[in-house]
């Protein structure tokens, strides 16, 4: 491509300005003489060369992203024997490459969570901060500071007005997500608070800790109103079911316990993992028929189970689906090459998504007990993931300090 005389003149002036800004005066004078540029430098060309350079890099990255997407689409068309029908939202799964790679945390990311209403997400980190990001534009919005040690988990109430954070500093903080102020700090655990969740009603929180207990907190007063004891080691995660009548917890003691909130009684004790259980989540109603189908294939069962069902992820590299009412493991998914750090059901119910220390994000067709897609997601351990409940996005966070947003289609 040949530059026009005007473009050449502008390029020369931009180069001259760059040499001047860098203090290369001898080179500048020689260049001005060779390029026949007498007189003072024009201020309108200040910084132009750097701007052009960064624009080229940005465009080059976009071109590479588009080429990767085109290649992915061509592969799908080739393997599918022709253009596929548009997938319905329950079939959407994350596709490479990532839409955004976001940086800002100074230590490993421990949790990523989409806001239930706004187009923002929050992350927590071992750097003791919580950060807010716009997942549609990739813009960083703000940092919430207050904890004095690693922030381990985050939770929104169903309205999205309140955010709760739990930390290795042994506290839980409640944030007004409209004013971004800490409105209450809850004290009571004797060790690292590894997990936090709002009950669906929004008036109570449940937390899990390395002190081996689970606590329930009244939000209006900040008081601990119940303590659940029974795990023999660090309680890693606690999650309430859809109506808030049950809570499930998993632990370093390799068990999952399901508790009746009203009575604090342990309804069942699920054992089949043979290492620390890192994460668990309840199955949505949309998953019930698929789970029954998967269990029928595996166990030859015909009777439909109403559930409820759980999915768990462990350092034994496996993912398990559990029938809480029967107290049994229905399905085991194997394929990760290292600890599985986070797991959840796809909102449509057909898939399970997981992330691992093997640096991958995996999508499981659990009805057929196979991994449907593997994405090499990060350059280090992938510690956390979230699947947006209604928009086609998945977010992942890693020990490599990056947060990635993946589009689903």
Swiss-Prot record:
Lineage: superkingdom: Eukaryota
Cellular component annotations (GO), alphabetically ordered: centrosome; cytoplasmic microtubule; kinetochore; microtubule associated complex; nuclear envelope; transferase complex
Keyword vocabulary terms for this entry: Cell cycle, Cell division, Coiled coil, Cytoplasm, Cytoskeleton, Microtubule, Mitosis, Repeat, Transport, WD repeat
PROSITE patterns: LISH (PS50896), WD_REPEATS_1 (PS00678), WD_REPEATS_2 (PS50082), WD_REPEATS_REGION (PS50294)
Protein's GO biological process: cell division; establishment of mitotic spindle orientation; microtubule organizing center organization; microtubule sliding; nuclear migration; vesicle transport along microtubule
Domain LisH: 7-39
Assigned protein family: Belongs to the WD repeat LIS1/nudF family.
Comment text on domains: Dimerization mediated by the LisH domain may be required to activate dynein.
Biological role stated in the UniProt entry: Positively regulates the activity of the minus-end directed microtubule motor protein dynein. May enhance dynein-mediated microtubule sliding by targeting dynein to the microtubule plus end. Required for several dynein- and microtubule-dependent processes.
Listed name of the protein: Lissencephaly-1 homolog
